[in-house]
Design a protein with these regions (language model features):
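Helical catalytic core of nucleic-acid polymerases
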Residues: 41-43, 52-53, 59-60, 84-96, ...
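Basic, short loop/linker segments at the boundary and entry of helix-turn-helix/winged-helix-like folds
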Residues: 24-68
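Anion-binding and metal-coordination hotspots
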Residues: 4-6, 67, 74-87, 96-514
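Hydrophobic alpha-helical membrane-insertion signals
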Residues: 1-29
Length: 514
């Protein structure tokens, strides 16, 4: 019979040299060397006043190492970070075997709001000294992530006031019903009556508390307005966050925006914004990144950041830029026929309506018989549309507008080919723009010419390969799937910490401190 060496699982006292656990070339080694030799954390140390009295505090440098190492391993929960500090030898090594409580870790991250920008900038400056910033092209983009906020507790001030009124009416109705039930109940016949009353009172107290919190919120918070004027929805749990439409549905969260250098994918600017509008983020992100740019650095962004106002401001400040518009790919022959390669939506996650089958294109204006001399328009079904305006203006361009009638459009057999949403749209409208008119969007037309040139297309094509791998690294490798804090300053701190992890990882890959 075969014989094997015995397996002894009894306790062992094994010598571990903590410093030897930090191997050159790894992220943790670069992080340890970077914070100990490069960072000036005196501003964090100045927060403590325990020189003569009070217990010793955890070193801010050690706390920063722990948090950044945890984020690099996909650990964001302060309780999970506390656990690995006690169990993982790598965390023991980088912290000198200190084991801060989860409350200490959470308080440290929350308290970095005022200092995080300076610390983040220090990492960028070190990347620059290592020659990792090329300054030829910066790519700007953002990722929308859920936050620690309830999507159900959001709405305009009018909607929240209506919600409070509905809760108060429900409380009155419940009180009235409870009094009736109590009068019908005879003493001693219901042994559980006291417990039932306690349960009722608990529900009533919860409803009253909800209504009271909504009323207090409305009194202490003004209406939120978008840049274009309409009221934005407020949120009771985190009023800095916003409702945002994504490919996976609507979320309550923040946009984590980043400006990335094309040379080695170093993040040169990062900011978390409680807004789903990307157009409003373009200029602030460029302003943050200009400290690391030159006069020749080209700023690139996708169509979400495109607006005439943004392009005008870039032109006035003489900032080289390539900002795509919504029709850029349609003008590019390389993308002709790309729709046949698109996969269908995932019914479990994608809540958008299924795309129309191939060959189901809608009627376009050229399918209508328009006679400018006789002022008439005949639809593909042979019905006459009536004129609803000869000199209408849209984006500065003049056009002649026609409308159908319910009498003709509702029973029409071609509704599905004519209307985008035939189930909700009763009639078809069509506009014919006057020919030969110059576009009033002067800066947009200039950007189109620039981005459609051979040089513009070649340079813009590098944008997606510059910025998308950064978000892929943060979201999937580092498992950043949501922000865990509330309030824009704290969420911005968490976003910058993750961006620091990415930059330090780049330093480690390029031989920092070896």
């Amino acid at each position: 019979m075969a014989r094997f060496k015995a397996v002894n699982m009894s306790p062992r006292f094994l010598p571990v040299v903590l410093e030897q656990q930090l191997v050159p070339g790894t992220f943790e080694y670069a992080l340890h060397a970077l914070i100990d030799s490069e960072f000036d954390l005196s501003v964090l140390a100045a927060k403590f006043r325990n020189d003569e009295t009070g217990a010793p505090a955890y070193d801010p440098a050690v706390m920063l190492k722990i948090v950044l190492l945890a984020y690099s391993r996909g650990l964001v929960s302060s309780r999970a970070i506390e656990r690995v500090c006690a169990e993982n030898v790598l965390f023991m090594a980088i912290s000198g075997d200190t084991q801060p409580a989860y409350t200490t870790i959470a308080a440290f991250v929350r308290g970095l709001s005022d200092e995080i920008t300076a610390i983040f900038t220090e990492v960028i400056l070190i990347c620059d000294r290592q020659g990792l910033i090329g300054r030829q092209m910066f790519a700007i983009d953002g990722v929308k992530l859920p936050s620690n906020a309830s999507k159900a507790k959001s709405g305009t001030h009018a909607e929240l006031a209506h919600q409070a009124q509905a809760i108060e009416r429900r409380v009155k109705s419940m009180l009235k019903e409870h009094r009736k039930r109590d009068r019908r109940s005879e003493q001693g016949q219901h042994p559980d009556l006291a417990a039932e009353r306690a349960s009722r009172q608990e529900r009533l107290d919860a409803l009253k508390s909800d209504a009271k919190s909504i009323r207090a919120f409305l009194q202490s918070n003004a209406q939120r307005r978008s840049g274009k004027g309409p009221e934005r929805k407020s949120n009771l749990t985190d009023n800095d966050s916003a409702k945002m439409a994504t490919g996976k549905g609507v979320i309550q969260g923040y946009t984590g925006a980043a400006t990335v250098d094309a040379s080695h994918q170093i993040i040169v600017a990062a900011q978390a914004h409680g807004s789903g509008s990307e157009q409003s983020l373009l200029i602030p992100m460029i302003e943050q990144a200009r400290a690391f740019a030159t006069a020749q650095t080209v700023m690139t962004a996708d169509a979400g950041y495109h607006s005439e106002a943004n392009l005008k401001q870039l032109s006035e400040q003489a900032i080289p830029a390539l900002i795509a518009d919504g029709l850029m790919r349609r003008r590019d022959a390389r993308f002709k026929g790309q729709d046949k390669y698109k996969t269908g939506p995932d019914p479990l996650y994608d809540k958008r309506p299924a795309p129309k089958p191939a060959g189901s294109g809608k009627f376009r204006p050229e399918d209508f018989a328009y006679d400018s001399q006789k002022n008439t328009c005949i639809c593909p079904a042979g019905k006459r549309l009536y004129s609803s305006g000869q000199h209408c203006t849209t984006n500065g361009r003049t056009h002649h507008k026609f409308k159908g009638t319910k009498r003709d459009c509702v029973p029409c057999a071609l509704r599905d080919q004519c209307l985008r949403t035939p189930e909700t749209t009763p009639i078809r409208q069509v506009a014919f723009f006057h020919k030969g008119l110059a576009s009033p969007l002067r800066h947009t037309e200039a950007m189109k010419r620039r981005i459609d040139s051979a040089a513009g297309r070649a340079l813009y094509a590098r944008r997606i390969a510059t910025v998308e791998p950064v978000f892929g690294n943060l979201r999937y490798n580092k498992r950043l799937d949501r922000f865990t804090l509330r309030g824009q300053p704290k969420v911005d701190t968490q976003w910058k910490l993750y961006c620091m992890v990415h930059n330090i990882e780049k330093l480690a890959h390029h031989g920092y401190a070896q």
